[in-house]
């Protein structure tokens, strides 16, 4: 398995993501934001952080980068799997690769905590816990889109920490090859962190690509 981890100015979860990939025996390479081709990789990660300082809005500038343009070509070619975590989820929505948008948390405060989640996948053990850390994690979408969007939901908050519509914490696109989520599975892989629920997500990616 060969993973590419896209690094923008302001990305800060790239190392965590690389270590998590290597825990599963994957080759993991950093990809700078000016890269114009991603086709060498089985899975592409857009990790968390504050791409371009979150100027304009979270993900609002990253969507214009060469790497995101290359990501769109990667998606068209059906080459592999794409996962955007936290800021990566924001970028996927800004780029139009996932529906809806991520807005400022209700209460306007940055939230950093361990949160309960309910996962819509039989490979997961019902309820899990993962870290979150974001100021713009409130998922929103037009009301007339919500019926279709709810069919794409992969993970929901059990105790909504940010005011997300319908408790949405993460969702797929229609192909089930693009996944965006606000919680951080890469921060819950090693036993030293006291929580290994993030391993289920990496195991899911392996299963998707078999």
Task: Give the residues covered by each predicted segment.
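Amide-donor transfer/coupling interface in amidating biosynthetic enzymes
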Residues: 41, 73, 102-210
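N-terminal beta1-alpha1 cap of cysteine-dependent amidohydrolase-like domains
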Residues: 1-85, 92-99, 105-111, 143-145, ...
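Active-site metal-binding loops of divalent metal-dependent hydrolases
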Residues: 49-50, 88, 135, 185
């Amino acid at each position: 398995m060969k993973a590419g981890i896209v690094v923008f100015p302001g990305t800060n979860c790239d190392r965590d993501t690389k270590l998590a990939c290597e825990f599963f025996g994957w080759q993991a390479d950093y990809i700078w934001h000016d890269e114009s081709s991603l086709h060498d990789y089985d899975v592409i990660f857009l990790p968390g952080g504050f791409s371009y300082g979150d100027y304009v809005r979270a993900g609002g500038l990253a969507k214009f980068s060469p790497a995101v343009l290359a990501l769109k070509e990667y998606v068209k070619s059906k080459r592999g799997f794409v996962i955007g975590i936290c800021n990566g989820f924001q970028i996927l929505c800004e780029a139009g690769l996932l529906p809806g948008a991520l807005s400022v948390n209700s209460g306007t405060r940055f939230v950093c905590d361990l949160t309960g989640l309910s996962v819509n996948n039989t490979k997961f053990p019902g309820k899990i816990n993962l870290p979150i850390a974001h100021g713009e994690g409130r998922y929103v979408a037009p009301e007339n889109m919500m019926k279709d969007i709810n069919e794409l939901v992969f993970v929901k908050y059990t105790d909504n920490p940010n005011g997300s519509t319908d408790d949405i914490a993460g969702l797929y696109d229609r192909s089930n090859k693009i996944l965006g989520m606000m919680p951080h599975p890469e921060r819950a892989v090693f036993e030293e962190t006291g929580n290994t629920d993030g391993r289920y997500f990496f195991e899911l990616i392996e299963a998707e690509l078999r």
